[in-house]
């Protein structure tokens, strides 16, 4: 019986964690508020990729890869995106 209770608790925790990783759609001011909050919490300042070129930053994929023609609005307003995607724009 204890094993069943432990198993159900474990499944519940896994379900909550996986639900928190699902993407959400952010548009307009909600997207701006979310970006400001995430970037502020992460301690990012908006700088260009060229600023980091001499500091060994090519190891960071979010700074070394080009996002192409798609922007944050295309990526997070038209389809759900996660916090990791949003953080890549900080």
Curated annotation (Swiss-Prot):
Gene3D superfamilies: Insulin-like (1.10.100.10)
Superkingdom in the source lineage: Eukaryota
Role of this protein: Brain peptide responsible for activation of prothoracic glands to produce ecdysone in insects.
Any one GO molecular-function label of the UniProt entry: hormone activity
Subunit (UniProt): Heterodimer of a B chain and an A chain linked by two disulfide bonds.
A Pfam family the protein falls into: Insulin
Chief localisation class: secreted
Sequence similarity: Belongs to the insulin family.
Subcellular location: Secreted
Disulfide feature: 27-77, 39-90, 76-81
Protein's UniProt name: Bombyxin D-1
Positions of the propeptide removed during maturation: 48-68
Other information: Silk worm has two kinds of PTTH: 4K-PTTH and 22K-PTTH; there are many forms of 4K-PTTH.
Result, substituting residue 23 to R: In strain: Kinshu
Keywords of the record: Cleavage on pair of basic residues, Disulfide bond, Hormone, Secreted, Signal
Chain ranges passing through the membrane: none
Range of residues in the leader sequence: 1-18
Gene Ontology CC: extracellular space
Organism expressing this protein natively: Bombyx mori (Silk moth)
């Amino acid at each position: 019986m204890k094993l069943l209770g432990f198993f159900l608790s474990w499944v519940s925790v896994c379900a909550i964690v996986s639900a928190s990783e699902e993407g959400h759609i952010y548009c307009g001011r909600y997207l701006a508020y979310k970006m400001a909050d995430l970037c502020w919490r992460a301690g990012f300042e908006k700088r260009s990729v060229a600023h980091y070129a001499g500091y060994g930053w090519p190891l960071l994929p979010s700074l070394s890869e080009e996002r192409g023609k798609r922007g944050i609005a295309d990526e997070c307003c038209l389809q759900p995106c996660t916090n990791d995607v949003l953080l890549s724009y900080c």
